[in-house]
Amino acid sequence: MDYKDTLLMPKTDFPMRGGLPNKEPKIQEEWDAKNIYQKVLDKNEGNPSFILHDGPPYANGNLHMGHALNKILKDIITRYKSMLGYYAPYVPGWDTHGLPIEQALTKKGVKRKELSIAEFRKKCEAFALEQIDNQKKDFKRLGVKGDFNNPYITLKPEYEAAQIRLFGEMADKGLIYKGKKPVYWSPSSESSLAEAEIEYQDKRSPSIYVAFDVIDGKGIVDDDAQFIIWTTTPWTLPSNVAITVHPDLTYGQYNVNGKKYIIGKDLASDVAEALDWDEDTLELEKEFKGKDLEYIKAQHPFFDRESLVINGLHVTTDAGTGCVHTAPGHGEDDYIVGQKYNLPVISPVDDKGVFTDEAGQFEGMFYDKANKEITDLLKEDGSLLKLEFITHSYPHDWRTKKPVIFRATPQWFASIDKVREDILSAIDDTQFKVDWGKTRIYNMIRDRGEWVISRQRVWGVPLPVFYAENGDIIMTSETVNHVADLFEANGSNIWFEREAKDLLPEGFTHPGSPNGEFTKETDIMDVWFDSGSSHRGVLEARPELSYPADLYLEGSDQYRGWFNSSITTSVATRGQSPYKMLLSHGFVMDGEGKKMSKSLGNVIVPDQIVKQKGADIARLWVSSVDYLADVRISDEILKQSSDVYRKIRNTLRFMLGNVSDYNPATDAIAEKDLLEVDKYLLNRLREFTANTLDHYDNYDYLDIYQEVQNFINVELSNFYLDYGKDILYIEERDSHKRRSMQTVLYQIVVDMTKLLAPILVHTAEEVWSHIPHVEEESVHLTNMPERVEIDQAFVDRWNTFMKLRDDVNRALEVARNEKVIGKSLEAKVVIGSNENFDATTFLQQFKDLQQLFITSQAEVVDKVDDGVAYQHGDIRIEHAHGEKCERCWNYSEELGSVGELDNLCPRCQAVVKTLV
C-alpha cells in the first residue's frame, strides 16, 4: 500500500479551466430546453412582483459595451429578485423608428425617391426586425434571461395603437397643440429635433458688434445715437425685428469720439475693451432704465424696416452689450418676448438650411456661408463695429454630428408648461439611489421648453391628425381612437396606404368640409414619444407586468431622453410617474478614461470578450466597476477580471472536491456539535451572506465583488481551506472532525454558488451541477440563502484569535527567513502572555492549536524565554521536535509502523489501521 492511497484527496469532475466561450452556449441551450426562465416565473407566481421595465435600445447596429453594461446590470437585478422569491418577469424591448434606419437603408443603396412612402416604410420595418434578431442573439449570449420570444417592439401594431390612444388622451386634456415656433432644426437631417436629440460640441463662429441707427428716440435718446448689439449668428440678422433691453437695467448714451452709442451701463467697460475704445474717451451723456427705452425705433442695418426696442427679462449682463438682437423666428426667448409685442416671426430658411426669397439678396445661400456675405455688407455700410472669431459650445444633431439652428416652422407640441408642476411633484415621490440623479431630472423638467413632437420624416408613427377643407384641425377622441383601432388591426402603414377620408370613422362629417374632403397630417411623432409611451404599450398592456414599474435603469443620457419622455406622458395621462425608482449608469470608456473610437484603436466590443474570455468575464467586469459614474475597460482590466474569476473558480473547485463523499442527509453534523473553528466559519459565512444580500438590495455590485474576494482570500484561502487540508485529507473519512468541516464546507459552496448566481450565471450553474445531493435542476430555481443571526460574542472571540494567528504567521515568516524552518509544518510555536495581551489565559479556550497554526506542535506557556513580543503575546518559533510523518508530514516524537507503512505518527497509525 502506498501512503497516498490512504489519503482522502479531493475528487470532482468540475474542471479547473473554465473554457467559457465553448461551455456557455451549451449551458444556455440547456436553459432553453428545460424552459428555466418560465419555471422561475412559475415558482414565484402569486408572490409579490418586481418589475424592471426595459428601456428599448435602438434597433440598429452591433452591440457596444454600453449595451452590455446596461443589460447585464438589469439581468443581475432581475435574477437576484427572482431568487428572493419575487415574481420578476423581464420583457426586453426595442426602439425601431427614426432617422438612423432611414439613413442605413440609403447607405445600403435603397433609392428612397423611387419608392412610395408605404414601400419604403416596409423596407425600414424589415431592416429593424433583422437588427433585432441580431441584437437578441447577442444579448442572450451575455447570459441575459427574459422573454426574448415575445419582446415588445415599438413598430408592432398593438404598441402603435397604445401610443396613439395615449396621444389622444393628452389631446383631450388640451396638452397637444400646433404652433409656429422656433425649434431645434437640423439641416443635415431636414427635421426638427427635441432637446434630447441635441448634443453640444465646440464650434468656431463669427462674433460681431453691430450698430443700429435710432430713427425715433421718443425724446429720450438722441435721434443720431446708435444701439449696439452683439451676436455670434450674423445669419439671423435678416430676421431681426427688434432690440431687447432689460426693463430694470441701467443704460447709458455714451459719446465716443463724436459718435453716440447706447449700451448697458454695467457692460460699458467690457464693450469699450472689446471695441478697442480708450475708456478715457468714453463720455456718459445720459442714463436711463431699460423700461424708458421701450418703443424707441431703430433702423434695420441693411433692410428697409424698423427694429423696435422692447423689454425682456431674459437680457443679462453676463456678456454682450445689454442690447439684444431679437429675431423671433430663430430663438425661443426672442419668440416669447416677440409674442408680447405682436412682432412678426420671420424665418427665411428652408428645410436644408438655405435662405429663401424672404432673405432678399441672400436667397439660395446656405445659412452658415451667408455669415461672411452679411458681415461684408455690414462693413460696407459702416454698421459693423467689430468682427472676430470665437470657439464656443454649440448645439449639434446627435446623429449627424452637424450644427443645428433655431428655426420657426409649423410644428406639433406637447405642452410641458401645463404639467410641469405635476411632473416635478411626481419626481419628488420617486426613489433615487443617488441625490444627483433626482437633481438632474428635476432641473431638466424645470428648465425644459415645450416638447416639439412632430418630425418631418416618414419612418415613424403618424400624427393622427386630419384637416378640413377650410384648414380646421380635426383631432377628436372619436377620430384618434378610430385611427388607433385601424393601427391595431393593420399597422400604421395604413396611414400611408389610404386616403384621409378612408381613415376617418364611417359617415364622419365636419362643418369645415362641406364637400366631404379631408387631408391628413404628413408629420410623424418624435421617437421619444414612441419609447416614452412604453408604460402604456407594455407595462399596462401585458398581463405579467404592472404599472408603475418598480425600476427604470438606463444610461445617464436618459435623464433627458427616455426617463424624461416617460414621466411626461405618464403624468400627463395617469397623474403619476411610471417608475417607483430611477437608477442610471455611466458610459464605458477605455482604460485611460478616454472615449472609445475606431480611430484611436481602443474599442472593445462585447462579442470580442464573449469569444475570447466568455460572458461571465464580462459580467464579472460589470460587478467590478462603480457603474454610477463612467467606467473603464481595457485588455488589462479584463485580465484582472479573468484573474479574479480564476481564483473564484479554483476555490469553488477545491471545495467541490472535498465534499464529493459528503451527503448532507446522512453526514451532516448539527450546529451545536460542530467544532469551534467550523462554527466560526459558519458564522463568517452568515456575515458574508448578510453583507452580500445588503449589497444586492442596494444595487452595490462593486461591494459584492470586493466582499467575495475578501471572503475567498482572507477567510478561505489564507486560513480555512489551508487549515482544512490536514483534516480533509488525513483524518478518517467519517471522523467527527472531518464531517464537521465538510458540513460547513458544503454550506459554503451551496450558499456561495447561490450568491454568485446573478452575476456568474453560467459558472454558478456549472458548479451547481457538480454539488452532490442538491435537489433543484438549476441554481436559478433556488432561493437566496436566508439571513441568520450570528453569535457576535463567539465571533469576536475568534476574530481575536485570528489576529493572534496573524502574529504567529509573522513569527513563522521571520523563522523561515532565518532558515530555522522551511515549511510551517517544520515549526513548533511557543506562545505566552506579555504586557499587551494575556495569551496564556485566552488560548485555554482553543483546542488543536498546532492544526489551527498549520504547524506540527504548539505550546502555551506562562512566559516565553527568548520570545519576540507581538501584539497578542510573546512568540518563539523553534524547529519541530521528532521526525516527519511520511503520511501527514507533521513532526512527531512517536513514529511507528502499520503493515508496510513506516514512520507514521500516532494519528496516522490509527487511521491506517482502519484501512488495512
Swiss-Prot record:
IleRS has two distinct active sites: one for aminoacylation and one for editing. The misactivated valine is translocated from the active site to the editing site, which sterically excludes the correctly activated isoleucine. The single editing site contains two valyl binding pockets, one specific for each substrate (Val-AMP or Val-tRNA(Ile)). It catalyses: tRNA(Ile) + L-isoleucine + ATP = L-isoleucyl-tRNA(Ile) + AMP + diphosphate. Gene3D superfamilies: 1.10.730.20, HUPs (3.40.50.620), Ile-tRNA synthetase CP2 domain-like (1.10.10.830), Valyl/Leucyl/Isoleucyl-tRNA synthetase, editing domain (3.90.740.10). It is found in: Cytoplasm. Catalyzes the attachment of isoleucine to tRNA(Ile). As IleRS can inadvertently accommodate and process structurally similar amino acids such as valine, to avoid such errors it has two additional distinct tRNA(Ile)-dependent editing activities. One activity is designated as 'pretransfer' editing and involves the hydrolysis of activated Val-AMP. The other activity is designated 'posttransfer' editing and involves deacylation of mischarged Val-tRNA(Ile). InterPro entries: aa-tRNA-synth_I_CS (IPR001412), aa-tRNA-synth_Ia (IPR002300), Anticodon_Ile_BEm (IPR033708), Ile-tRNA-ligase (IPR002301), Ile-tRNA-ligase_type1 (IPR023585), Ile-tRNA_ligase (IPR050081), M/V/L/I-tRNA-synth_anticd-bd (IPR013155), Rossmann-like_a/b/a_fold (IPR014729). Belongs to the class-I aminoacyl-tRNA synthetase family. IleS type 1 subfamily. Its main location: cytoplasm. It comes from the Bacteria. Keywords: Aminoacyl-tRNA synthetase, ATP-binding, Cytoplasm, Ligase, Metal-binding, Nucleotide-binding, Protein biosynthesis, Zinc. A motif ('HIGH' region) lies at residues 57-67. It is an enzyme of class 6 (ligase). Zn(2+) binds at C885, C888, C905, C908. The lineage of its organism: Bacteria, Bacillati, Bacillota, Bacilli, Bacillales. PROSITE patterns: AA_TRNA_LIGASE_I (PS00178). This is Isoleucine--tRNA ligase.
